[in-house]
């Protein structure tokens, strides 16, 4: 548990269904990564205030090798923040994001063999991860990538996610194929 002047924060593993429901209620992007190892909830006074997913992107080994090309690290050496979201009351209050990340770092040390915590920090949305930098994450730069934009919602979708989403939407709508 982590304490500041405002909250005593505790992390607990959540059932996938509960974590996904929270994310779909409060995160702007409803798409979740496929490789999720942990669904974690941030609690204060038994109230769920936020959720984070930890796992890996689509190429876990290539990611760690690209970041640390001269080291002999493997996928188990790191975890990636896939989604992190909080109740609206905790956003922009000046401390909750940093408190959550501090609590998460402590949880990782106590519960995993993870050496590094990594995130792309909503780079697809043009963000550079201010909350992560404020919590002493090291900014390693940016890279360009292609994205699709859903015309109905305005959501940006990575091309790797688009194919699966189109298949799922086609099945839901009872049609053979959906296209952008």
Annotate each PLM feature:
Residues 23, 36-56:
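Conserved beta-hairpin
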Residues 5, 17, 48, 73-75:
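A short, polar/charged loop/turn motif at coil->beta-strand junctions and beta-hairpin connectors
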Residues 13, 55-180:
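Acyl-donor binding region in acyl/amide transferases
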Residues 1-35:
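Short amphipathic alpha-helix that is part of the acyltransferase structural core
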């Amino acid at each position: 548990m982590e304490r500041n002047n405002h909250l005593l924060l505790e992390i607990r593993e959540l059932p996938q269904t509960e974590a996904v429901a929270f994310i779909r209620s409060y995160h702007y992007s409803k798409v979740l990564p496929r490789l999720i190892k942990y669904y974690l909830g941030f609690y204060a006074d038994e109230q769920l205030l936020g959720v984070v997913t930890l796992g890996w992107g689509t190429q876990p080994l290539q990611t760690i090798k690209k970041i640390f090309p001269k080291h002999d690290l493997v996928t188990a050496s790191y975890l990636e923040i896939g989604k992190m979201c909080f109740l609206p009351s905790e956003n922009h209050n000046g401390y909750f994001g940093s408190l959550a990340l501090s609590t998460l770092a402590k949880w990782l040390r106590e519960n995993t063999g993870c050496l590094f915590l990594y995130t792309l920090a909503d780079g697809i949305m043009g963000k550079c991860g201010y909350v992560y930098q404020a919590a002493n994450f090291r900014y390693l730069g940016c890279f360009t990538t292609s994205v699709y934009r859903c015309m109905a919602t305005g959501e940006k979708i990575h091309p790797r996610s688009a194919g699966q989403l189109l298949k799922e939407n086609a099945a839901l709508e009872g049609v053979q194929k959906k296209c952008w």
